[in-house]
Amino acid sequence: MAFDFARATKYFLMWDFIKGFGLGMRYFVSPKPTLNYPHEKGPLSPRFRGEHALRRYPNGEERCIACKLCEAVCPAQAITIDAEPREDGSRRTTRYDIDMTKCIYCGFCQEACPVDAIVEGPNFEYATETREELFYDKQKLLANGERWEAEIARNLQLDAPYR
Protein backbone atom coordinates (compact mmCIF):
# COMPACT_ATOMS: atom_id res chain seq x y z
CA MET A 1 0.00 0.00 0.00
CA ALA A 2 1.47 3.30 -1.13
CA PHE A 3 1.42 6.49 0.87
CA ASP A 4 -1.11 8.99 -0.54
CA PHE A 5 0.46 12.38 0.14
CA ALA A 6 -2.49 14.47 -1.21
CA ARG A 7 -5.03 12.66 0.97
CA ALA A 8 -2.86 12.93 4.06
CA THR A 9 -2.35 16.67 3.48
CA LYS A 10 -6.12 17.25 3.27
CA TYR A 11 -6.63 15.21 6.44
CA PHE A 12 -3.94 16.87 8.56
CA LEU A 13 -4.66 20.42 7.38
CA MET A 14 -8.40 19.89 7.96
CA TRP A 15 -9.22 21.11 4.45
CA ASP A 16 -12.94 20.23 4.76
CA PHE A 17 -13.16 22.16 8.02
CA ILE A 18 -11.53 25.22 6.42
CA LYS A 19 -13.91 25.08 3.43
CA GLY A 20 -16.93 24.81 5.72
CA PHE A 21 -15.71 27.65 7.93
CA GLY A 22 -15.15 29.84 4.86
CA LEU A 23 -18.65 29.13 3.60
CA GLY A 24 -20.11 30.00 7.00
CA MET A 25 -18.18 33.27 7.16
CA ARG A 26 -19.33 34.21 3.64
CA TYR A 27 -22.99 33.86 4.70
CA PHE A 28 -22.29 35.57 8.02
CA VAL A 29 -21.15 38.82 6.38
CA SER A 30 -23.59 38.77 3.42
CA PRO A 31 -26.89 40.73 3.54
CA LYS A 32 -29.72 38.87 5.23
CA PRO A 33 -32.37 37.51 2.83
CA THR A 34 -35.14 37.41 5.46
CA LEU A 35 -37.43 40.29 6.36
CA ASN A 36 -38.14 41.52 9.86
CA TYR A 37 -41.83 40.79 9.21
CA PRO A 38 -43.98 42.99 11.37
CA HIS A 39 -41.84 46.01 10.52
CA GLU A 40 -40.86 45.13 6.94
CA LYS A 41 -43.17 43.70 4.31
CA GLY A 42 -42.22 42.19 0.98
CA PRO A 43 -44.00 42.88 -2.30
CA LEU A 44 -47.24 41.05 -3.10
CA SER A 45 -48.16 39.72 -6.52
CA PRO A 46 -51.16 41.37 -8.23
CA ARG A 47 -52.66 37.86 -8.26
CA PHE A 48 -52.39 37.46 -4.49
CA ARG A 49 -55.58 36.04 -2.98
CA GLY A 50 -56.24 37.48 0.46
CA GLU A 51 -59.28 38.72 2.33
CA HIS A 52 -62.54 38.80 0.35
CA ALA A 53 -64.26 42.03 -0.61
CA LEU A 54 -67.42 43.10 -2.45
CA ARG A 55 -66.96 45.99 -4.86
CA ARG A 56 -69.18 48.87 -5.87
CA TYR A 57 -69.44 50.80 -9.12
CA PRO A 58 -68.02 54.35 -9.09
CA ASN A 59 -71.57 55.72 -8.67
CA GLY A 60 -71.89 53.76 -5.39
CA GLU A 61 -74.18 50.98 -6.63
CA GLU A 62 -73.29 47.44 -5.63
CA ARG A 63 -71.78 45.38 -8.44
CA CYS A 64 -73.30 42.07 -7.35
CA ILE A 65 -76.21 41.06 -9.60
CA ALA A 66 -77.14 38.01 -7.47
CA CYS A 67 -76.39 35.51 -10.22
CA LYS A 68 -75.12 33.09 -7.54
CA LEU A 69 -72.34 31.76 -9.77
CA CYS A 70 -69.81 32.25 -6.97
CA GLU A 71 -72.00 30.27 -4.60
CA ALA A 72 -72.37 27.46 -7.14
CA VAL A 73 -68.67 27.24 -8.01
CA CYS A 74 -67.32 27.38 -4.44
CA PRO A 75 -65.83 23.92 -3.73
CA ALA A 76 -65.90 24.51 0.03
CA GLN A 77 -69.52 25.75 0.01
CA ALA A 78 -68.43 28.76 2.02
CA ILE A 79 -70.66 31.32 0.24
CA THR A 80 -74.37 31.85 0.98
CA ILE A 81 -76.45 34.29 -1.06
CA ASP A 82 -80.09 35.35 -0.76
CA ALA A 83 -81.62 37.71 -3.31
CA GLU A 84 -84.83 39.58 -3.99
CA PRO A 85 -86.08 41.28 -7.17
CA ARG A 86 -85.89 45.05 -7.54
CA GLU A 87 -88.60 47.32 -8.90
CA ASP A 88 -86.85 47.48 -12.30
CA GLY A 89 -86.79 43.68 -12.62
CA SER A 90 -83.14 43.10 -11.73
CA ARG A 91 -82.05 41.20 -8.63
CA ARG A 92 -80.42 42.52 -5.49
CA THR A 93 -78.59 40.58 -2.81
CA THR A 94 -80.16 40.77 0.62
CA ARG A 95 -77.64 38.40 2.16
CA TYR A 96 -74.08 37.67 1.07
CA ASP A 97 -72.17 35.64 3.65
CA ILE A 98 -68.76 34.00 3.45
CA ASP A 99 -67.61 31.56 6.10
CA MET A 100 -63.87 32.22 6.11
CA THR A 101 -63.28 29.12 8.24
CA LYS A 102 -64.40 27.02 5.26
CA CYS A 103 -62.83 29.10 2.48
CA ILE A 104 -59.79 27.55 0.78
CA TYR A 105 -58.85 30.75 -1.13
CA CYS A 106 -59.00 29.03 -4.51
CA GLY A 107 -60.21 32.16 -6.33
CA PHE A 108 -63.02 30.36 -8.19
CA CYS A 109 -65.58 32.88 -6.90
CA GLN A 110 -63.56 35.74 -8.36
CA GLU A 111 -63.12 33.95 -11.69
CA ALA A 112 -66.82 33.05 -11.95
CA CYS A 113 -68.15 36.55 -11.22
CA PRO A 114 -69.25 38.22 -14.49
CA VAL A 115 -69.11 41.75 -13.04
CA ASP A 116 -66.02 41.52 -10.79
CA ALA A 117 -68.17 42.02 -7.70
CA ILE A 118 -66.44 39.52 -5.40
CA VAL A 119 -62.65 39.72 -5.31
CA GLU A 120 -59.89 38.49 -3.08
CA GLY A 121 -58.02 41.58 -1.99
CA PRO A 122 -54.47 42.31 -0.90
CA ASN A 123 -55.08 42.07 2.86
CA PHE A 124 -53.57 39.03 4.56
CA GLU A 125 -53.46 40.36 8.12
CA TYR A 126 -56.92 39.63 9.47
CA ALA A 127 -56.35 37.40 12.46
CA THR A 128 -59.23 37.29 14.91
CA GLU A 129 -59.71 36.35 18.52
CA THR A 130 -62.99 34.52 18.03
CA ARG A 131 -64.30 32.20 15.37
CA GLU A 132 -67.46 34.27 14.89
CA GLU A 133 -65.41 37.15 13.50
CA LEU A 134 -64.50 34.96 10.53
CA PHE A 135 -68.11 34.87 9.33
CA TYR A 136 -68.25 37.79 6.89
CA ASP A 137 -71.60 39.34 6.09
CA LYS A 138 -72.46 41.72 3.26
CA GLN A 139 -71.65 44.87 5.28
CA LYS A 140 -68.19 43.58 6.23
CA LEU A 141 -67.45 42.57 2.63
CA LEU A 142 -68.58 45.96 1.28
CA ALA A 143 -66.45 47.73 3.90
CA ASN A 144 -63.44 45.67 2.78
CA GLY A 145 -64.17 46.66 -0.81
CA GLU A 146 -64.29 50.35 0.05
CA ARG A 147 -61.09 50.12 2.10
CA TRP A 148 -59.07 48.32 -0.59
CA GLU A 149 -60.77 49.59 -3.80
CA ALA A 150 -57.77 51.49 -5.18
CA GLU A 151 -55.39 48.57 -4.77
CA ILE A 152 -57.96 46.01 -5.95
CA ALA A 153 -58.64 48.02 -9.13
CA ARG A 154 -54.90 48.34 -9.81
CA ASN A 155 -54.35 44.60 -9.29
CA LEU A 156 -57.25 43.69 -11.58
CA GLN A 157 -55.89 46.02 -14.25
CA LEU A 158 -52.41 44.45 -13.99
CA ASP A 159 -53.93 40.96 -14.14
CA ALA A 160 -56.29 41.72 -17.06
CA PRO A 161 -53.93 40.54 -19.86
CA TYR A 162 -53.80 37.07 -18.29
CA ARG A 163 -57.54 36.57 -17.82
Swiss-Prot record:
Biological process per Gene Ontology, one example term: aerobic respiration
Cofactor(s) listed: [4Fe-4S] cluster
Membrane-topology descriptor: Peripheral membrane protein
Details of cofactor binding: Binds 2 [4Fe-4S] clusters per subunit.
The protein's Enzyme Commission number: 7.1.1.-
Domain 4Fe-4S ferredoxin-type: start-end pairs: 54-84, 94-123
Family the UniProt entry places it in: Belongs to the complex I 23 kDa subunit family.
Protein name (record): NADH-quinone oxidoreductase subunit I
Lineage: Bacteria, Pseudomonadati, Pseudomonadota, Alphaproteobacteria, Rhodobacterales
